[in-house]
């Protein structure tokens, strides 16, 4: 089975590509070639935003799965439909759990929760993309599967709520130095974190699965924590008291 990963070097996609390779998938990464290619994977260097260049490099190629990790809005997926309509049996789009209705009308949030987020443009763009893909599936049978991750982290990007221009690790540095950190609200709101390795197991299970075509899934852990608990866990791992 062959898979084309558009991107493939981010927090989520790195873990998915590694696990897919371990499971026997022939993985090709399509990106601008700015990072080393992991062992066992093929590389195609192109900018996905250059449709003509990607069309040329795709000549004579087909894939069981096209895994799109960097598409943002409607224009991105419209381009992908043109590029991959005849090139794949399954197109998996990474959306976002932030697309779900805000404020939430009830819990738990499921895949059937309405997609309405007036507060964040990123989420609205993801919703726009989902609508285009769903319409293409219903009208032309475009083989889309939609995946909505929540807050995903790994060893290179620890889970924090708010950080400055120096990134997530700056928050851990502040905890180490005993400096105060900002926790959302009163710290009691619930949040779901998912390690990228756990996300990858769910994602790879959808790859090549015909029952996933035309459906949407969120992949998250099964544990919710308050933001106070999350930051207390970080401080405990650093063997420092939390100053918040």
What are the residue ranges of the model-derived segments?
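Conserved beta-loop-beta element that borders a ligand/cofactor-binding pocket
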Residues: 131-160
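Substrate-positioning beta->alpha
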Residues: 163-171, 184-207, 214-215, 229-232
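Mid/C-terminal beta-alpha module of Rossmann-like enzyme folds, strongest
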Residues: 205-244
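Short-chain dehydrogenase/reductase
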Residues: 107-111, 115-131, 151, 161-169, ...
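Rossmann-fold cofactor-recognition segment
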Residues: 40-50, 70-72
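N-terminal Rossmann NAD(P)H-binding glycine-rich loop of SDR-like oxidoreductase domains
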Residues: 3-23
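Glycine-rich Rossmann NAD(P)(H)-binding loop
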Residues: 7, 154, 183-189, 217-224, ...
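NAD(P)-cofactor binding segment of oxidoreductase domains
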Residues: 61-108, 117, 124-135
């Amino acid at each position: 089975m062959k898979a084309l990963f558009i991107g493939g070097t981010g927090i989520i996609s790195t873990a998915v590509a590694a696990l897919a390779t371990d499971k026997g998938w022939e993985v090709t990464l399509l990106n601008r070639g700015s990072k080393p290619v992991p062992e066992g994977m093929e590389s195609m260097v192109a900018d996905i935003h250059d449709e003509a260049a990607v069309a040329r490099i795709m000549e004579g190629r087909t894939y069981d799965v096209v895994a799109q990790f960097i598409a943002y809005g409607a224009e991105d997926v419209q381009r992908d439909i043109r590029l991959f309509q005849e090139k794949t049996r399954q197109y998996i789009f990474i959306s976002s759990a932030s697309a779900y209705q805000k404020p939430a009308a009830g819990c738990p949030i499921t895949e059937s929760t309405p997609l309405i987020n007036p507060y964040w443009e990123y989420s609205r763009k993801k919703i726009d993309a989902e609508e285009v893909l769903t319409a293409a599936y219903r009208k032309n049978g475009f083989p889309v599967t939609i995946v909505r991750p929540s807050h995903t982290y790994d060893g290179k990007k620890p889970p924090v709520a708010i950080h400055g221009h120096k990134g997530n690790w700056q928050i851990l540095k502040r905890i180490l130095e005993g400096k105060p950190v900002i926790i959302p609200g009163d710290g009691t709101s619930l949040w779901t974190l998912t390690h990228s390795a756990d996300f990858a197991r769910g994602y790879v299970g959808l790859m090549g699965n015909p029952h996933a075509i035309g459906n949407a899934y969120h992949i998250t852990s099964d544990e919710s924590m308050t933001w106070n608990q999350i930051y207390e866990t970080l401080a405990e791992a650093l063997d420092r008291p939390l100053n918040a």
